[in-house]
Amino acid sequence: MDELCKEYNKEHPDINFHTNYDSSGTLMTQIKEGAKCNIFFSAGVEQMDELEKGYDGGSVEKDNRKDLLNNQVCLVTWKGSNTKVKSFKDMSKAKNMALADETVPVGQYTRKALINSGLVSGDKEKADDLKDTDISKVLGGLEINSCANVGAVAAAVAGGADEIGTVYYSDTFGYEDNLEIIEKLPNSLTGDVIYPVAPLKSDDISDAEFNASNEFIKFMSEEKAVKLFEKYHFSMS
């Protein structure tokens, strides 16, 4: 996003960006609790849907909401780990796993994959209720180390603290020397991994700010932006 903002500023130097990066669940909570935000760019549809219901003092402008990007969940290990895990269904062969918690989109997608693959029994619509203890039990006592966001998962596995973990394909960018992809999970297991974006409206957001937000969102689908997204392993939705 920093590169994208810099590219946009080349033609719009009057626009000032103040970016806040965290898990989509954390960002959603911050917005609902009153943090000012002009644009919400989420790694999960569920968090955007929740804000679209409305919150105290603001709302998602749903007519301008756009499903912008696609991603893919990957099972990874650290390079040189000599893990016995060769696929998602082999995860019980690992000693430990870094897993984003159930409020984080990549953690939610992973839990859906566990159910859809038959590794864990349950209702895929209630995948978010699947706790680490449940996962550990069905995977033969695999040690699950909960992470607050996908970046923490990538760092834990790349640093060798955990043998395996699930991250987005985009999160492997920059870790080529440290991470090895064991398997890219098919969407039939995870569901579509969609990144929606939308402008927000609230009492403290001016019409000028709202219009500027819409212009930037339009730019996010233009050729210069597409090339940047593809560089980081995203595809356009």
Say what each PLM segment does:
Residues 1-12, 16, 25, 45, ...:
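Exported/periplasmic ABC-transporter solute-binding proteins
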Residues 19-29, 36-52:
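Ligand-binding clamshell of periplasmic/extracellular solute-binding protein-like
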Residues 30-31, 156:
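CheY-like receiver
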Residues 31, 65-68:
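Short, glycine-/small- and polar/acidic-enriched structural segments
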Residues 34-35, 160:
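Active-site charged/polar residues at nucleotide-handling catalytic sites that mediate phosphoryl
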Residues 55-66:
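Central helical "cap/lid" subdomain
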